[in-house]
Amino acid sequence: DEAHCISQWGQDFRPSYLKILEFLKKLPYRPVLTAYTATATAEVRDDIMDILNLRDPFVLTTGFDRENLYYAVKRPRDKYRELLSYLKEKEEKMPGSSGIIYCLSRKNVEEVCYQLREDGFSVTRYHAGLSDEERKENQEDFIYDRKKIMIATNAFGMGIDKSNVRFVLHYNMPQSMENYYQEAGRAGRDGESAECILYYSPQDVRVNQFLLDTKENMGDFTEEELQNIRIQDRQRLRKMTQYCTTKKCLRKYILNYFGEQTAEKCKACSNCSEEYEKTDVYPIAADILGCVKEAGQRYGINMIVGILAGAD
């Protein structure tokens, strides 16, 4: 399972997975081998087959389109205020809804969990800094609906199959489309409508870039291998950032990323469902450029702004 971990092109390459090959070679005969993953691009799928030396394999791709999921990207000035407003509205419309809020760091998890608890929400938390016992208890509280909202890092989710999750909200931008798709995909597994909302800010890009640049060498990689992995990580981060800033259909972006095609508009994402007002800005732009040209280099930007605004 999680076969993408065997590929250096995958978003979560683990050198320990390469030991599978050593194990297979020691067996008296080669058994039938199956490899499963929910988040592999065509490139990664080919790499998995090559590394495992799969002979004429039967490849089954079930598709990446989850039609019951609504995708949205928001750029709030105050993320917590936006989150609080969303949860209050959700509670009014669908009381007791279960949801997951993913945060980039343990600190974010602790802060958001504390604030939501203070605001009266049924919440629990999950990250690698908690003891095994507390993580297990918190996970079971969420799975069995003793707590309605889980606030967690990406440490939460492996093997979790809670069917009635009505929303997955990312408080920070993840590092890759693979991570986002996997985490957002924990919503709506009962087939009913669910929402996948991402709160984006440019600061998320800088933080993720820092985390990638300072990531420790956990796999005894050579410097060349480590450099190649970092290049792949940066490319994935760019694709994730493009998802957060595109004006095109979000569902189409996700499916195209994983090598699938779809209609131009899905009408089930924030970009397709929002109506934009078209405005001819040519006259305004012409006034600005004309003023700058007339002023030459005699005045600074504040003076130019003042002139355009009609200041004395």
Predicted regions and their residues:
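Pre-recognition alpha-helix immediately N-terminal to the DNA-recognition helix
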Residues: E82, K239, D287-G290
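Residue-level preference for well-ordered alpha-helical positions
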Residues: L24, M49, L255, V305-A309
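Flexible coil/turn residues that form the inter-helical turn or adjacent wing/linker of helix-turn-helix
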Residues: Y29, K247, Q297
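Short helix-to-turn junction characteristic of helix-turn-helix DNA-binding domains
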Residues: L87, F142, C244, V292-G296
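Accessory DNA-binding and partner-docking regions appended to nucleic-acid-acting proteins
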Residues: V207, M218-E223, Q232-R234, L250-K252, ...
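Short, charged low-complexity linear segments at domain edges
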Residues: N228-F258
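Helicase motor core with emphasis on the C-terminal RecA-like subdomain
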Residues: E2-E224, Q235, G259-T262, N271
